[in-house]
Structures are given as C-alpha cells and as structure tokens.
C-alpha cells in the first residue's frame, strides 16, 4: 500500500488522547481517535462528517463570534470552517494559504433585461403564478412586524409551524421566520440537528431555488402554513440565501445552471477561491467558508432567483431574511477586473424592482410593504448602514454579543446596554446613515447557538434568554427576533430532542415572554428610558412613556430577590405585574416606584389601577420559621416576601390600616402596628414603634452592621462567609457560614451584624466545598481596608488575600473588573513582536490588532475595555507574520495568563502557575501519520490536510496548525 505521509508532533508523556481530521478543504474525512505512542494508518474517507472539536477555525473570528458559515460544507457546530474574520489576510488564514485555481474564463453570456424572459429560456424557469392574488389579512403589515416580535422557528417544518400558530399568536408574536425553504442538499438526508445524521446546515446549501425541501416540507405545505398564519394575523418571513450554493455542484439543478448560462457562469470567476473578511472585493466575489460564491450579478441568475421570491410572496410570504447579505455587492462596491461592466452590482436594486413589478402585475405586496432585512455580521468593512438603505434592515450582531456578555456576567449596566453599536458608512464617498429603527435584534441567533456554544448554551441558560429577550423586546428601537432553541435542550444536552421538523423549546411562549411581547405592542412608539434602580447594575429598568401610554419592564439578573425603590416616569398608582401567575404589585407614590423582583426574574408593568398603598417591612431578628402578615385583623393572612437579609415585606393596597406579623406556624406574634400616611413602614418584633428605614430600625434594636467585601476572582459558584469573635463566638453559625450577597462585577458582601460593642472580628471566605481563604483576622469596626482580594501569585493551598480600602484599588491591583480586563501573554517562542487582536465584547482594530510593549517582568499585557465574558475573544500574534495563538476566550476573572507550554497555547490562573507549567514541560516526541487516499482521482481530494485536536483541556487543538491543518506530503509513486 502506498501512502502519503506527514510528520506530526505529539507529546507522548502527556498520556492524553487526541483526534485528527483529514480533509481536502471542501471535504472532511472521519475523525480518528489516537492514543499517545500509537502509529496510525488511515484508509477510508467520508464526506461531510462533523468535527467533535471545539478548536478555533482561523486566526480571527467575527466581531459577533457567530459566523457566516452556518451553511458550510461540514456540520457547522464544529469550528473547522472559517469564521467571520476581521483580519484574515495573513498567510495561515483558513483557505487563503492554499493553492487554489480560479475558474476558467467563460464566454460572454447573452441575457435579457432584468424582469424579462426570452422564449428560449422561459422553459428553464419555474415561474411564479401570474393570476391576480387576493389581499392578505389587512392586519399583517410591515409596521405590524416592525413594531411587534418575530419568532425564529429554527428547523420547524411548515406543518409544525401551522400546528402551533395559535400558540405563536397567543404569545404575542406578529411574525414567524422559517428556516430556508428552498430545495437543498439531500445526499445524506438525516433529520437530526446534530451528530452523525445532524444535517440542519443542509438547508443552507441550496441546490435549486424552488420552494420545498425534504427537511421542512413541500410547496403545498408552505402555502398551507401561510394561509394559517394569515388567519391568525401572523406574518411569515422566509430565510433566503442567494449568495452561494452547496459545494456538491453535481447536485445543482440543471435548470438553474442553464438559466445562469452554464455551470461556470453561475459562479463568480473567483467564486471558488477562499476570500478574506476585510476587503470588500473578497467579501463579495470570493468563496466564503468553502461555499462557492454565486454570481448574483448575472442577470440570468437574477431572473431565476426573483421568480422564487415572487412565488414566495404569492403563496403568502410577508418578508425575507437574507442570509450572508454582506457577501453580496452593493452598487458602489468594487468590481473585479475579470468583468468589463463596472456597473454590474445590481442584485439588490433589481430585487426591489422585480418584486415591485410583480406587485403591480398580480397584486402581491410591494417591496416596501414587505419586511426585508439582511444578515450583516459586523466587522471591518461591513457597510451596515449602506445595506440598511438598499435592503431595508439589517441584523445587530454586536448588540447581541454585548447582551449575552452582560447576561453571563450579571452586569446589566445601562452604559453597557444602551448603545446599539452601529455606525454610518462613508466607504466610497457617499454617506449612509445608520438607523436603529432598521435593526433586527436578538439575544442569540441560530449561528450563535449551533456554531458558538461558548457564548450561548454553555453560558446562557433559558432564564437568561428570557431576561435578555425582555430587554430587547421592551426597548423602542429595532425589531426583536426570538431564536427557538431545540426542545428539551440544556447546557448538558444542548440539542435536546435533536430533531429537524419538530417544535422547539416552549420557552418562546413563557409567561414573561408573552407579557413583554404584549407590552411592546401596547407601547408602540413611546419614548424609552433605561436605568439601574438605586445604582444596582444587576437590575435594569426599561421605562416607556408618552402622552397616551406608560409602562416599565424590570429585569433582575441577580440570583436573589431585589427590592426596588426608585424614581420613575410612571404616574402615581398601583401597577400589578402582568406576567401570568405573578401576584406582585408595584406602587408609585410621589414619583417613586416601590416593589421587588425575584432572582433572575422579570416584571412587566403596563396597567395602572387607581389608588395607593404601602410597602411594610418587618425585621425577623428572632428567626421565626417564616413570616406572614395580618391586616386589620382579617381572617386571612398575607404572604410576605423574603428579602434575604433578615427583612420581610408585604404590599398593602391602602394608606391607613393596622398590621401585625406572625410566624408561619402561628406561634409567634408581633405587636400591632398602626400605619398612617405619615408613619414609618419598618417594624421589628421588639416594640410597636415604626421606623423610616432599615438602618434606623436596626439601630433602634442596638444592631450594628459592619460590611466586608470579597472579590471573587476564583470564580466560585457561591461565596460563603464564616466568622467569629476573638472569644470564639460564631457570627454566622457553623461552617461554612452564610451565603454572601452578590453585588455584581465579581464583588460579594458579608454583613456582620452584632448587638453591643465589639473590638474586632475574624472571617474566612470559602466556596462551601473545601476551598477557602486564610483567616482574615483583626477586622475592627473602624477598619477601612475591608475590600479583600486573593493574591494568586502568593497563594499555595489556602488562598492568601490582600486588603484594600475600596473596590477600585483592588481591581487595579489585579488588573480586572466588571468593566475592564487585563490579558497577559508570555513570549516563549521568541517572536520579534507581539500583537493582540480582539473581537466580540471589544475590538482593538483590524488584524493583527494592537502592538504591545514588554513589561518589566518579561510578560506582555493589554487592558481590554470590557469585563470577562464568553464573548471576550483574543488572539496574540507576531504581527501578521505567520505566528499566533488559537482563539482564546477571556471568560472569567482568573484565567487570563497565556503562553505556549510546549504542547499548545493555554490559559493559566496566575503568572506563577504559567511559569511552573513551562518548568514542568516534558520532552516532545514525534509520530508519523499515514493516510491512504481512496479518492485520489477526485479533484476535490487532490490535496489532503491533517488537523489535530483533543486532550483533556484542548491542549492538542491546532497542534499542527489551525483548520484545515497541515498539507500532507504525497509519497512518490503513490496514488496519494
């Protein structure tokens, strides 16, 4: 047997398994597991097998960390394909560094004018109906979609959508978006989302532009779905993708090929050459992610494709989402020298004209009556504002990224979430103005969920999705789109039932989601005001108001209930929470809103009742087993809300009344309190006296509170505080103590409450599971250095802490906070320069990013203006000279120290740990990998690449280079 061979580096001393992929760029073989010291002979290939790796795709990913390659040649859940790349011009860029041959020059194609069909070609087309069409439901308009909410029924079949239309409408959605409805690749017609038969991406690989595919249903079923939607007043938006076809060109419909003038004419002259993501010419005329780039400027193709769009609207489509829209040229974009017509970039203007002409002909909606938006993932040269003008709307990928980052960190600061992060476009002398009203916003897209697990299901659970949705749907600008996650999905089982065609998770109709959708519809064009009540960045309030409507949505990202007492634009009155099943009531009196929101909860206020009331608080310092309230000696008691600090509150809808508090078992009873318009509302069990604040009440009981703060850079899931006095008396009971209060941005607060005078106390912070700080002793009532942070460089075993006088000093010393992150790199390979490139939560400019200077200790550091999150991405590189780390996420406050440990680039929790990894690195051994290429005669398998990944912590990822890996050497006299 003749074999091609490649010398690959492995570390046998590590004793860890790895996996490899063999590919030919457009095709991927089976993944093989390989143990250390094993020789390996491979003699089989298989197309379109997914990768199990979560290794990075290339040297730079899109600013949103989701990508345009959801429809790529292999299961996009693996990241072997090129992501949206703000800096992909370097030599080791995915697809760019390999030897590609452009398509041969083709003869000039004789085509008719846009919108006309020659007699000779008419038979090639599946023509849309030309009979006059009855009008749709008059309630379904572009405005009803724009001012409402869209459900993205990802991978739901047409019949499934129709069967669930009543629920969709009842949940307050004004539109439903389908997955692509065109004929698609079906060489391996699996019906799973993920796994060996996971073929969700097939419907992003068109083989023809006619309605119907094996995954979603037939043309008749599509029409039935549209008819049902019309009955319920729900619009239908179709996901379309004119930019590319499947790379399996043998599956392309003959009619499509002939309409374009032949197989070569269907694609751009450079349409099978991998392009970058920063140059407009490469963005629009080159292949993206291994998918051949359609010549969307070919008028024969345009006519064929526009007939597909006409058929869609004739059957009932009310709008379109254009996949990979920024990969199709705008009229003022450059044209390659391969073409003589400098004005050929006409796809979008001609699309508008064709749909308008069809509207006049048969009575369908005109272009401006349709809701059309394009997927324009933000990055260098995205030209978002210009696409808004030519298409009508665009996505808001950067805002989605910031929102997910905020949710995963629990930091809902207005400063972080107010700006939609879109900008005017002046690329070619004209000014296009970015418009927030033309945005489609999301918490996550299907690209995020299926391709970028780190920023979605690994870090954003269903409750966070609902909170994020409540934010974007409550806001004034844009149109929110709710991505339907797979049914029964979770972080442990992200694909849930793993079925194409089935309905997704029911969270799309959760009570909070429905309430916010109806709130959005009611608020219309009302003004918005965002605030963090009481300065609490874990709570966000979105107020909407004008002369005719008013309301507010409050989102609490903390895990515990939070009490609200804040100034508001709402008029005085009583506001019941509109979330179904909630009994919460909020009061507004003298312009102050009062109430409470449960942990990770959402409150929707849009209905005002006349009247007034009082919130009365009771301090349970006797540790009763539950607290209830009895008002005016009523037979029934009222439940109270535990504020998790010893206080319980109850809302009474009256200004004057008597109230007493009782233990849940009725054995303990407080004095009776007389509440008046002028009285205080804070009570204790020790007397009938009323106070005007918690602090005043606790002082009246002789209670002194001494807060101490802990900076949780260790990423503990919970922080416990154990305390004792010098005499041995415990402050919070036995070990591990009490749960500290999460204040957000990594800070936790422990309140030491004592009666009488004390001279000092002592604390230990711990995670409740065996990891703890050293004893923090000698804290006095007058101590100012009450802000504690772990010193990772000095710790060994128990964690040593340093004490600071404020949060800012601690954050500066550690180089991290909720709003900035310092990332560190040690240059073990002797690069002549070190640059940092970032995307997602923040950007440092185009590739290769910002050049760094060496610190005194030999490390390089860069301060990033964003807190750690799953969307804070960084690549250290040597300035576009072929060397770089893989994609690294700075997702927490600890693991920010990066170096090559002799095997791969890894993150460490301190400089000390990183340097110890170098000192303990073992010797490198080498193994030879052999592969027998049974498809050597296939042009797509002319070259074979080896990609390596694996290891417990991914240390073997990119071992021989980023995807597609290293070109294997063909042995002489072999068939390869």
UniProtKB/Swiss-Prot annotation:
GO terms for biological process: carbohydrate metabolic process. It catalyses: Endohydrolysis of (1->4)-alpha-D-glucosidic linkages in polysaccharides containing three or more (1->4)-alpha-linked D-glucose units. It holds the Pfam family CBM26. Ca(2+) binds at residues 243, 284, 293, 327. Its EC number is 3.2.1.1. It comes from Butyrivibrio fibrisolvens. Keywords: Calcium, Carbohydrate metabolism, Glycosidase, Hydrolase, Metal-binding, Signal. This is Alpha-amylase. The keyword Secreted does not apply. Residues 50-60 have a biased composition (Low complexity). Monomer. The keyword Transport does not apply. Gene3D superfamilies: Glycosidases, Golgi alpha-mannosidase II, Immunoglobulins. Residues 45-98 are annotated as: Disordered. It comes from the Bacteria.
